[in-house]
């Protein structure tokens, strides 16, 4: 007993020493790992095999090719045997040779974060690509992170008011939700995205992050210039409201598969450290999956359905689960979705749909009527379109608007064949109100003032509900439908009608 007590006392005396020893060992191990050198043994397109004699870097660590300009970062994807890792290149591998020296950085890809990234364009590894000098910050974060714990998440369902009538009324966005933005070329996706960025900054004081994943370089350049014109990015002072992260179509698949995570990391900093409600735009989420499938084949994984990677659901889930509301702030994500060959059952879009809370569908038919934003009020949906979340009045008005628009749609064939005169009085009233509602769903955007000549309007949700409720009740049946076009709240309809009447007189 005495011997045991003495031994335990001796152990206690040893504890501080053991602690020092383990700390020094950990420091030495970290130093050795950070200083680990390897050499390239094989290059297969975007995949590079690197051999290390000791201190094999863990999976997802960033390696750097020595003496190469511009900087080439490799991300560890697999361990082959005892001393070789298979990595994915974040840039072109042209000119790499066997035996070339590679350094282990000791941690995953780290990028600059914080307010200094606003108004700037960075690439997948966090380097500025807008020719405006380095990003002056010492705050960095790793692009790979765990999703927030359950205890950190906020379970309250809350609307993110965008100030855009058609969105707030018929397919409202949930704070921390994920929205799919469907639309072809030229129907106004970019303008809608810019208006959302602008409104969130003005109404909530929040920041936005735009991740261009595998998009056209020309489109990325146009968006940047349009944001400068629209005042979303300011080159003169620090009032920019958006950070841009680009990995274009011409980039290797490694960069396109990781650039969405880079954008998400910038957004996570604003949410977790500054308590912001952040908007994260991803254009296009399909390219994230596409890049993953390109890399997967090179890594030697057996493809699954339609040639996609076997880890498709895991890759998508690990990214989407990080986009959520916590008790500190929220990330609301708007994701443009390309549907290959218009096949909604394709594994890539089908996997994305499982994560969406709302869909905003832009329709060419509505754009052709000159109604912008060209959001389809019957095709767009939202998970929070529930009276328990949005309130009974909002729910009733939204359903009333959709019903009258659906009735008008079913009457259009009769009108086309027989004309308006053949309709009953009740149907004529339905058509008149539906056309007024259709025009009242249009709205002048602040970022498009330069092109339209109309002053932009941000409409509070209460005024939106009040306006549509009054139109449904027939309070404005006496006003001409042209008065409802391109205005903000319902009071402006009355003003516009009075003005038109005076001009006509």
From Swiss-Prot:
It catalyses: ATP + H2O + 4 H(+)(in) = ADP + phosphate + 5 H(+)(out). F-type ATPases have 2 components, CF(1) - the catalytic core - and CF(0) - the membrane proton channel. CF(1) has five subunits: alpha(3), beta(3), gamma(1), delta(1), epsilon(1). CF(0) has three main subunits: a, b and c. PROSITE patterns: ATPASE_ALPHA_BETA. Mitochondrial membrane ATP synthase (F(1)F(0) ATP synthase or Complex V) produces ATP from ADP in the presence of a proton gradient across the membrane which is generated by electron transport complexes of the respiratory chain. F-type ATPases consist of two structural domains, F(1) - containing the extramembraneous catalytic core, and F(0) - containing the membrane proton channel, linked together by a central stalk and a peripheral stalk. During catalysis, ATP synthesis in the catalytic domain of F(1) is coupled via a rotary mechanism of the central stalk subunits to proton translocation. Belongs to the ATPase alpha/beta chains family. GO terms for molecular function: ATP binding; ATP hydrolysis activity; proton-transporting ATP synthase activity, rotational mechanism. PANTHER family: ATP SYNTHASE, ATP SYNTHASE SUBUNIT BETA, MITOCHONDRIAL. ATP binds at residues 183-190. It is an enzyme of class 7 (translocase). It comes from Drosophila melanogaster. Keywords: ATP synthesis, ATP-binding, CF(1), Hydrogen ion transport, Ion transport, Membrane, Mitochondrion, Mitochondrion inner membrane, Nucleotide-binding, Transit peptide, Translocase, Transport. Its EC number is 7.1.2.2. It is found in: Mitochondrion; Mitochondrion inner membrane. InterPro entries: AAA+_ATPase (IPR003593), ATP-synt_VA_C (IPR055190), ATP_synth_F1_bsu (IPR005722), ATPase_a/bsu_AS (IPR020003), ATPase_alpha/beta_chains (IPR050053), ATPase_F1/V1/A1_a/bsu_N (IPR004100), ATPase_F1/V1/A1_a/bsu_N_sf (IPR036121), ATPase_F1/V1/A1_a/bsu_nucl-bd (IPR000194). This is ATP synthase subunit beta, mitochondrial. GO terms for cellular component: mitochondrial inner membrane; mitochondrion; proton-transporting ATP synthase complex. GO terms for biological process: proton motive force-driven ATP synthesis; proton motive force-driven mitochondrial ATP synthesis. The keyword Cytoplasm does not apply.
